[in-house]
């Protein structure tokens, strides 16, 4: 059994929200680039001087060797490569988005941040899969978190409500919070909400309940966890003749508590990069488009298991389809 709760924000007859930040936020590409550089330097400083990691002990020779060796395919930890790297890429992407650059203009910042890290900030050879996951996964997670953080911004609020909104928005998109502090928007009061997107229809569902995971031949000896899942639908792909990047997306995630399974067991995201309504008749309609996908499934062996391979580990951090 599973307990579920959902919240629906009203649907619209027609789209009346804007798809580009250029009209709302001044473009500050040099500040965005500085933040990407500073982010990499901060992570490297932590790894080098606090954690004393060997891979962070870089010098001119290691950088030259990285360019000489060229990119290779690495076999680092599954969650590091396919969750941590895409999340890091989302911070690069959001450094640009929160400084007034639109979706397409922000893509080079995700790719550039990854290239800087892989070629300059580690003694290990540049990783092909890390660059792909950080760049493409970062683009998708970055745009999703940017738009979700926008839902909580309200410059009309004050007091405890304002603090709560800024904290929640900042947890979703840390780079946006940093830039709101830099520009003073975090405490500036105005007569408007100060959001980039307005009146976006949103569906949100949360589920909580036990989860049992076992291999078929050993179904009596699996693991039980407290599973928390959520699903969020943003926008409506059937409510407009044409839509641009991420006016519609769906995000699902699952978390396992009190078990040997990974905390993050599942992440699924699909967003429309471009789409168009191709047929409509009464209440029925058909839309076609190009969609970006992010899928991640992780599991672990039981602590007393005699097996050597986890039941499943599946991911696609860089995928596009129609």
State where each predicted segment sits.
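N-terminal targeting leaders of membrane proteins
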Residues: 1-84, 88-93, 97-103, 166-309, ...
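Alpha-helical transmembrane segments that form the membrane-embedded catalytic/substrate-binding core
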Residues: 88-89, 121-150, 168-172, 176
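Outer-membrane beta-barrel translocator/channel fold
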Residues: 125, 129, 147-159, 292-310
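A cross-taxonomic marker for long C-terminal extensions/tails that follow the last structured domain
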Residues: 316-322
């Amino acid at each position: 059994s599973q307990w579920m709760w959902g919240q629906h924000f009203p649907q619209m007859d027609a789209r009346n929200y804007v798809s580009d930040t250029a009209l709302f936020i001044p473009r500050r590409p040099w500040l965005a680039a500085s933040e990407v550089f500073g982010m990499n330097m901060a992570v490297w400083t932590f790894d080098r001087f606090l954690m004393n990691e060997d891979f962070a002990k870089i010098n001119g020779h290691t950088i030259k060797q990285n360019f000489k060796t060229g990119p290779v395919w690495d076999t680092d930890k599954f969650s590091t490569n396919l969750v941590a790297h895409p999340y890091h890429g989302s911070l690069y992407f959001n450094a640009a988005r929160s400084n007034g650059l639109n979706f397409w203009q922000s893509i080079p910042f995700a790719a550039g941040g990854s290239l800087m890290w892989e070629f300059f900030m580690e003694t290990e050879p540049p990783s092909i899969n890390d660059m792909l996951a950080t760049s493409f996964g970062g683009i998708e997670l970055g745009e999703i978190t940017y738009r979700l953080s926008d839902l909580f911004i309200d410059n009309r609020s004050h007091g405890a409500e304002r603090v709560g909104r800024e904290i929640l928005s900042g947890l979703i998109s840390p780079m946006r919070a940093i830039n709101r502090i830099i520009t003073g928007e975090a405490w500036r009061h105005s007569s408007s909400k100060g959001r980039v997107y307005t009146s976006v229809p949103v569906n949100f569902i949360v589920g909580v309940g036990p989860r049992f995971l076992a291999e078929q031949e050993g179904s009596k000896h699996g693991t039980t966890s407290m599973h928390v899942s959520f699903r969020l639908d943003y926008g409506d792909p059937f409510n407009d003749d044409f839509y641009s990047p991420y006016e519609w997306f769906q995000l699902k995630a699952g978390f396992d508590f009190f078990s040997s399974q990974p905390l993050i067991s599942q992440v699924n995201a699909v967003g429309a990069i471009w789409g168009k309504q191709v047929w409509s008749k009464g209440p029925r309609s058909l839309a076609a488009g190009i969609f970006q996908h992010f899928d991640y499934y992780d599991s672990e062996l039981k602590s007393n298991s005699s097996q050597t391979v986890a039941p499943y580990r599946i991911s696609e951090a860089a995928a596009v389809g129609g």
